[in-house]
Amino acid sequence: MKTFVAKPAEVKRDWFVVDAEGKTLGRLATEIALRLRGKHKAEYTPHVDTGDYIIVINAEKITVTGNKAKGKIYYHHTGFIGGIKAISFEDLIKRAPERVIEKAVKGMLPRGPLGRAMYRKLKVYAGTEHQHSAQQPQVLDI
């Protein structure tokens, strides 16, 4: 018996919509990353992007456990000397709630061109409205 290897042209990708309201950030992000990679499919191939498209709504209503709302700090650097910036989870969820889920999922995907292709299939929206109704996404209960 030969090992099955998926071909990029033959991969069937579905669209799923996930409601983040009341969900824990890390638990939701791991499930999303798994589905973006395609590891839930029998035809998973490590060097081929076999994952599905994921739409996340209600990103502003995601929760974290413990004292992480105040204690979790997100860092980025501007590129200039002394240009390190920090923002807490609490402030980032007010300013850009989509970025919280995007950063969590991006850290769980592989680095490189394949990981960037997987990340592009993630669509995150702060509210309940999204612009992908033409793709007829299925509701994914996580």
UniProtKB/Swiss-Prot annotation:
One of its GO terms (molecular function) is mRNA binding. PROSITE patterns: RIBOSOMAL_L13. Keywords: Ribonucleoprotein, Ribosomal protein. Transmembrane segments: none annotated. GO terms for biological process: negative regulation of translation; translation. The keyword Ribosomal protein applies. GO terms for cellular component: cytosolic large ribosomal subunit. Pfam families: Ribosomal_L13. Belongs to the universal ribosomal protein uL13 family. Part of the 50S ribosomal subunit. HAMAP family: Ribosomal_uL13. This protein is one of the early assembly proteins of the 50S ribosomal subunit, although it is not seen to bind rRNA by itself. It is important during the early stages of 50S assembly. This is Large ribosomal subunit protein uL13. It comes from Psychromonas ingrahamii (strain DSM 17664 / CCUG 51855 / 37).
